[in-house]
């Protein structure tokens, strides 16, 4: 017994390993039909069987680990074919990461073919099956337990969890796990793949996870590969996109700039407040010190505190003139004589002057027949040579212009959500109001009705089919419609499709929707429905483009549906463009009139903004006409000086006022005509702004000229022409000063690269110059004729009628306004106690404006361009409220890159083996920082999808063996073979000739159920193949910006995209190359101006001020200090304009910049006349000279430019257009009020303090000029 015991124990030890590791199967071959085309496996408990040789290729392809010895397996060739077919979906999504796919294949190869199945597979249910061919009874395996090691399951999940699905910009597991990728883990992923309710598994397989033997079973716990490990010597680890371990730590955006604060308060406020307080202390300290000094040493308390002792031309202190004084006096004398002689000539020969003036007007205005009006927004807002324009031109010529867009945003009026209960188990899923089946049917009816809209153009019918974007045409002529209904193939029957029985609904539109939002490119929804998600047009419909109002990525919570009809745009083809516009017009009319109580619709067509702008302009035309009519009426009445009712029609100057207005309008017409002759296009902003500007300048000059004459007395022996010549000699230098300085400033403003400012400056400069020339010629002649009419007592307007003689005649007189300025306003303003208050208030306002200077917003809210009652306003509001994706952005690689070399491919691709700083990888990284970069999604990459498409493991790339022509994956033909062999070399990326040989096939391949990677729909326009097929030209990689609402968002998005592209160009080493990478989005051409608008503003206003300074210092006779004071005052007006812009919510853009340039010119009118009058005054003190200048010129400036413009501006407040209310009413009102207050209040006070000393040479010249006349006594008081 003792000998037999050890022998028996030894036998047990020898038998145990054989029992544990023996090779035994649980099935072999396929038997009965499970469901649809899916079959059960046949129960088999014997040893593995040798695989027939015709299956060797398959086992090498799918399960190379089993290809050894006599290849004895537990599966036959048909099971391998079934395995390959069933793995096509995971192959398309997970093969990007070889380690992930290797582990997955391990799981399924062990399940299907492992020669040791019985160790970890336990059959739990079978049924008999009679083979109809052999009539043999076999046993189907209906249910199975699969024992899987937890270590293996977790390692497989970890290797796959980061893998991207580029076509949907989702994690691939979100498409393969039956739930969101975030909720997916190792166990529920494997459970879902083995659940027959997923539509793919033929029967139920229950996975049991354990690392220890359980119930006598040894779990399958094969070795795995991490995503950062290579599967073999040839294949590298997964890319950074698909494996976060490879990437290292997630990049962090730079911290936002720290606000500039002092003591916790805004630094600008603190600095300007402190500066203002310091100024007040110094200023009032000096004021009271001088006041005390004067009280102590001077008897009279009314002696001016500026210390400028009265100087008279008759005083004994003649003194010596400064070196520049005689030069200035000589220049002034020369201008007086020149204009006096010219004025006398015009009065003596009115017919000749008026005739030649009319001839000049007609000749110049005739150029209007060649006028070209620029209405294209691109030309209006973007300079032809700008970076955005060059990039747009490159994109349009290589890929075609960006499509036109017709879009609807639809909400359900019933806000009730509903709950979906998944079968057989799972958390309840809420669905938003518009995702109820009934609402979807109604929306589909609307969508179909829009598809059937017809329009007429040139007696031809235009349908959506004629103009729409159909990427697969002519194979598939379906229009691209980005709509959630395309998940249901735009079909009522598919929407109603469901699978169930009397008790339960296993799958319906809810199931399909939840799958499609995760896999929009899928051709089989992997549920019991088996409906495709791919749109009928052959491309994916991304959920973020067709759903709105959801939270995070819970698309089922959507509160709005978005339907977009992309329409072809045309590059330089007006005929086709107008056909599209004709259909859009019918589309707008249809949706406007569409009624459905269950739907609320916001919509816009491509032409909507232009249509609404035209409607807005027409609706505000009446308001504008009233504005100008009020100004014209005021001018006509205010020019006359009525002394008595009996002489009302004699002393009125209605005809002269109308003539002056016509001269102003003629100067505008001449300017337009001259530039039309030379081919400079006109913009709408010129038409809107220049009449206002020229009217301001022209009216001011008219009032100064006429009122100076009215206050003048004809000298003894002086004729009318001599008197008017002398008057013109007095005022024309001032008119010339203001007009010429404005002209030079505007012409220099033409150097601006901002199209609106450039065009405005050219037209404005010419109009102001012509207006001045016509005023000193034609208007002077007409004034002489009107005075002759008045002297002959003839009625105004009807000059052939003579009024009654009253003996009064034409006498010099002072108007009420002049007397008010002279006797009340000027003395009050220049009181000793008033002047410091004025200085303190204006410096305070200036300090405030400087403090908010950097807070003025940049940009232009597009909704401001729309009328308040426009349907587009509702669309803009819905756009910002519901949409979750911004405009598409294309990262363009210009022609020149070598895609056929491995190095060139690694620079751009994002998959296996690609550089960690490749183009696609950098955009992917940017999308992870979407709040900072404003890149919302990973890019669609044609080159990565091409590499997946051409893999020999895939069924996508095949050619006919006999002809070497492309064979689509849907074709069943034994002569179709793989494009590349299933060898180590064949599995590598194609290079050189291979790359170019198969690329056209990829770009022409339409997606189908057997291959969803065909690139025709997605990439046919993204890749330019050179004419001879030798290489790849320009290409693009598309993604989307995040939702952009405010102008600041658009500007920042463009800046960040350019920064990314610049970094890509640098990392690719293309700085010295002939090509580069640049981003393009349709809005860049409109928002690029804002990148430099601050610099443009400084440049334009600086050039204008510089020009005004130079011209003024020359024309004012080298009065340098007076010029400095005038320019400082104008600069204060401009700075205060920014303060008003901040207070009134006016942003800085091309429109407001044009207004600022214009305000610079108009400010000259408010300041130059008074400054020049101050320098010419011969009164003793600065206070007296300021008072005289304000009395004589201030009244004309106030009655001319101020009251004229104020009356016209107030009417603009009633305009319907928001852009008129904000950029014209508000800014024009600010220009006039700030100009008037600075010119008529601040400037005289400033001159009274620090104005230049009297020009002694000019005062002596004045004495000589009036010696012996009645005016001599006026100079000596």
Curated annotation (Swiss-Prot):
Disulfide bonds join 25-74, 31-42, 63-109, 75-113, 97-238, 100-160, 177-184, 227-243, 240-247, 468-479, 516-533, 909-914, 956-1011, 957-979, 967-976. Its main location: membrane. GO terms for biological process: bile acid metabolic process; cholesterol homeostasis; cholesterol metabolic process; cholesterol transport; intestinal cholesterol absorption; intracellular cholesterol transport; intracellular lipid transport; lysosomal transport. InterPro entries: HMGCR/SNAP/NPC1-like_SSD, NPC1-like, NPC1_MLD, NPC1_N, SSD. The record marks 108 as: Important for cholesterol binding. Cholesterol binds at residues 41, 79. Keywords: Cholesterol metabolism, Disulfide bond, Endosome, Glycoprotein, Lipid metabolism, Lipid transport, Lysosome, Membrane, Signal, Steroid metabolism, Sterol metabolism, Transmembrane, Transmembrane helix, Transport. Gene3D superfamilies: Multidrug efflux transporter AcrB transmembrane domain. GO terms for molecular function: cholesterol binding; lipid transporter activity. Glycans are attached at residues 70, 122, 135, 185, 222, 415, 452, 459, 478, 898, 916, 931, 961, 968, 1028, 1063. The chain crosses the membrane at residues 270-290, 351-371, 622-642, 654-674, 678-698, 735-755, 760-780, 833-853, 1098-1118, 1124-1144, 1146-1166, 1195-1215, 1227-1247. It catalyses: cholesterol(in) = cholesterol(out). The keyword Ligase does not apply. Residues 1274-1277 are annotated as: Required for location in lysosomes. It is a multi-pass membrane protein. Residues 175-205 are annotated as: Important for cholesterol binding and cholesterol transfer from NPC1 to liposomes. Residues 23-269, 372-621, 675-677, 756-759, 854-1097, 1145, 1216-1226 are lumenal. It is found in: Late endosome membrane; Lysosome membrane. Interacts (via the second lumenal domain) with NPC2. Interacts with TMEM97; the interaction may decrease NPC1 availability to the cell. Interacts with TIM1. Interacts with SLC38A9; this interaction inhibits cholesterol-mediated mTORC1 activation via its sterol transport activity. Intracellular cholesterol transporter which acts in concert with NPC2 and plays an important role in the egress of cholesterol from the endosomal/lysosomal compartment. Unesterified cholesterol that has been released from LDLs in the lumen of the late endosomes/lysosomes is transferred by NPC2 to the cholesterol-binding pocket in the N-terminal domain of NPC1. Cholesterol binds to NPC1 with the hydroxyl group buried in the binding pocket. Binds oxysterol with higher affinity than cholesterol. This is NPC intracellular cholesterol transporter 1. The gene is NPC1.
């Amino acid at each position: 017994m003792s000998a037999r015991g050890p022998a028996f124990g030894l036998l047990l030890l020898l038998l145990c390993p054989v029992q544990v590791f023996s090779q035994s199967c649980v099935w072999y071959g396929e038997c009965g039909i499970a469901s649809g085309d899916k079959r059960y496996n046949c129960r088999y408990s014997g040893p593995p069987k040798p695989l027939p040789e015709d299956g060797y290729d398959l086992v090498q392809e799918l399960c190379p680990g089993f290809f050894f010895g006599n290849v004895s397996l537990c599966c036959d060739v048909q099971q391998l074919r079934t395995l390959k077919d069933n793995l096509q979906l995971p192959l398309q999504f997970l093969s990007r990461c070889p380690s992930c796919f290797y582990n997955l294949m391990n799981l399924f190869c062990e399940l299907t073919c492992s020669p040791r199945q019985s160790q970890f597979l336990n059959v739990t249910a079978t049924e008999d099956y009679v083979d109809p061919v052999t009539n043999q009874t076999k046993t189907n395996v209906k249910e199975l337990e699969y024992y899987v090691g937890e270590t293996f399951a977790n390692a497989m999940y970890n290797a796959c969890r980061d893998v991207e699905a580029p076509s949907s910009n989702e994690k691939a597991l979100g498409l393969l796990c039956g739930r969101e990728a975030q909720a997916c883990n190792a166990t529920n992923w494997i459970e879902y793949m083995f659940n027959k309710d997923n539509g793919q598994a033929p029967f139920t397989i229950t996975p049991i996870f354990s690392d220890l033997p359980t119930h006598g079973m040894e779990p399958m716990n094969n070795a795995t590969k991490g995503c950062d490990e290579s599967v073999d010597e040839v294949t590298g680890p997964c890319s950074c996109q698909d494996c976060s371990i490879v990437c290292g730590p997630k990049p962090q955006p730079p911290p936002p700039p720290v606000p500039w604060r002092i003591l916790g308060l805004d630094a600008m406020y603190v600095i300007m407040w402190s500066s203002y307080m310091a100024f007040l202390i110094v200023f009032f300290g000096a004021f009271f010190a001088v006041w005390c000094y004067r009280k102590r040493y001077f008897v009279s308390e009314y002696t001016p505190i500026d210390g400028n002792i009265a100087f008279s031309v008759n005083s004994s202190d003649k003194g010596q003139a400064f070196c520049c004084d005689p030069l200035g006096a000589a220049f002034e004398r020369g201008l007086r004589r020149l204009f006096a002689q010219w004025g006398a000539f015009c009065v003596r020969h009115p017919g000749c002057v008026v005739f030649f003036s009319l001839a000049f007007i007609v000749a110049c205005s005739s150029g209007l027949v060649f006028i070209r009006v620029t209405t294209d927004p691109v030309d209006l807002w973007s300079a032809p040579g700008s970076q955005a324009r060059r990039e747009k031109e490159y994109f349009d010529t290589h890929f075609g212009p960006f499509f036109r867009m017709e879009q609807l945003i639809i909400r359900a009026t019933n806000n009730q959500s509903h709950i979906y209960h998944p079968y057989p188990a799972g958390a309840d899923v809420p669905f938003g109001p518009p995702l109820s089946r009934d609402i979807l049917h109604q929306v589909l009816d609307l969508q179909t009705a829009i598809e059937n809209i017809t329009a007429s153009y040139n007696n031809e019918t235009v349908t959506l089919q004629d103009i729409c974007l159909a990427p697969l045409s002519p194979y598939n002529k379906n229009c691209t419609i980005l709509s959630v209904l395309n998940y249901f193939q735009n079909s009522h029957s598919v929407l109603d499709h469901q699978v169930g029985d009397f008790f339960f609904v296993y799958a319906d539109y809810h199931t399909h929707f939840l799958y499609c939002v995760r896999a929009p490119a899928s051709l089989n929804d992997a549920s019991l429905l088996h409906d495709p998600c791919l749109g009928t047009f052959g491309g994916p419909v991304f959920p973020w483009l067709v759903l709105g109002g959801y939270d995070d990525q819970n698309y089922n919570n959507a509160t709005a549906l978005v339907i977009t009809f992309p329409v072809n745009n045309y590059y330089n083809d007006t005929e086709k463009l107008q056909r599209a516009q004709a259909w859009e017009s019918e589309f707008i009319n249809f949706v406007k009139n569409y009624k459905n109580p269950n739907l609320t619709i916001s919509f816009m067509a491509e032409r909507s903004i232009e249509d609404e702008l035209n409607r807005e302009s027409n609706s505000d035309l009446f308001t504008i006409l009233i504005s100008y009519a009020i100004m014209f009426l005021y001018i006509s009445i205010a020019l006359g000086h009525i002394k008595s009712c009996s002489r009302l029609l004699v002393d009125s100057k209605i005809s002269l006022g109308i003539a002056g207005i016509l001269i102003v309008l003629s100067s505008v017409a001449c300017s337009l005509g001259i530039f039309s002759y030379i081919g400079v296009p006109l913009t709408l902003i010129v038409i809107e702004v220049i009449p206002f500007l020229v009217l301001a300048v022209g009216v001011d000059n008219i009032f100064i000229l006429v009122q100076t004459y009215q206050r003048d007395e004809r000298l003894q022996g002086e004729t009318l022409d001599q008197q008017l010549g002398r008057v013109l000699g007095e005022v024309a230098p001032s008119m010339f000063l203001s007009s010429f300085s404005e002209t030079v400033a505007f012409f220099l403003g033409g150097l601006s690269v901002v199209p609106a400012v450039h065009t405005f400056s050219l037209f404005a400069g010419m109009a102001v110059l012509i207006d001045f020339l016509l005023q000193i010629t034609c208007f002077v002649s007409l004034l002489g004729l009107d005075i002759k009419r008045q002297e002959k007592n003839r009625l105004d307007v009807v000059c052939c009628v003579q009024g009654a003689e009253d003996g009064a005649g034409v006498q010099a007189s002072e108007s009420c306004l002049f007397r008010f300025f002279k006797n009340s306003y000027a003395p009050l303003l220049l009181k000793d106690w008033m002047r410091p208050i004025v200085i303190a208030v204006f410096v305070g306002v200036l300090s405030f404006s400087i403090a908010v200077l950097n807070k003025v917003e940049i940009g232009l809210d597009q909704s401001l361009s729309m009328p308040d009652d426009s349907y587009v306003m509702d669309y803009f509001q819905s756009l910002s409220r519901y949409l979750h994706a911004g405009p598409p952005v294309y990262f363009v690689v210009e022609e020149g890159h070598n895609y056929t070399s491995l190095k060139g491919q690694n620079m751009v691709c994002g998959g296996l083996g690609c550089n960690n700083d490749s183009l696609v990888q950098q955009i992917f990284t940017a999308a992870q920082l979407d709040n900072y970069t404003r890149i919302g999604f990973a890019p669609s990459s044609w080159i990565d999808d091409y590499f997946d498409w051409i893999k020999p493991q895939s069924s996508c790339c095949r050619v006919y063996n006999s002809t070497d022509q492309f064979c689509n994956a849907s074709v069943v033909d034994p002569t179709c073979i793989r494009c590349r062999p299933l060898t180590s070399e064949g599995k590598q990326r194609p290079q050189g000739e291979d790359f170019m040989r198969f690329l056209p096939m990829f770009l022409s391949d339409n997606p189908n159920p057997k291959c969803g990677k065909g690139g025709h729909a997605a990439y046919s326009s993204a890749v330019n193949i050179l004419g001879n097929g030798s290489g790849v030209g320009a290409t693009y990689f598309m993604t989307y910006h995040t939702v952009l609402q405010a102008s600041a968002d658009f500007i920042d998005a463009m800046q960040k995209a350019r920064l990314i592209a610049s970094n890509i160009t640098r990392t690719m080493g293309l700085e010295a190359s002939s090509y580069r990478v640049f981003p393009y989005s349709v809005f860049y051409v409109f928002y690029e101006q804002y990148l430099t608008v601050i610099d443009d503003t400084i440049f334009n206003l600086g050039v204008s001020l510089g020009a005004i300074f130079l011209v003024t210092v020359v024309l004012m006779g080298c009065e340098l200090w007076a010029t400095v004071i005038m320019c400082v005052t104008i600069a204060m007006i401009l700075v205060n304009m920014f303060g008003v812009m901040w207070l009134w919510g006016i942003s800085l853009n091309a429109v407001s910049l044009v207004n600022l340039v214009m305000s610079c010119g108009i400010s000259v009118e408010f300041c130059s006349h008074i400054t020049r009058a101050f320098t010419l005054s011969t009164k003793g003190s600065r206070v007296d000279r300021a008072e005289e200048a304000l009395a004589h010129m201030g009244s004309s400036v106030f009655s001319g430019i101020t009251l004229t413009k104020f009356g016209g501006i107030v009417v603009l407040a009633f305009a319907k257009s928001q852009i008129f209310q904000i950029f014209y009413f508000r800014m024009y009102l600010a220009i006039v009020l700030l100009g008037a207050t600075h010119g008529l209040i601040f400037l005289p006070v400033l001159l009274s303090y620090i104005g230049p000393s009297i020009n002694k040479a000019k005062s002596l010249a004045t004495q000589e000029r009036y010696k012996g006349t009645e005016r001599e006594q006026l100079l000596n008081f």
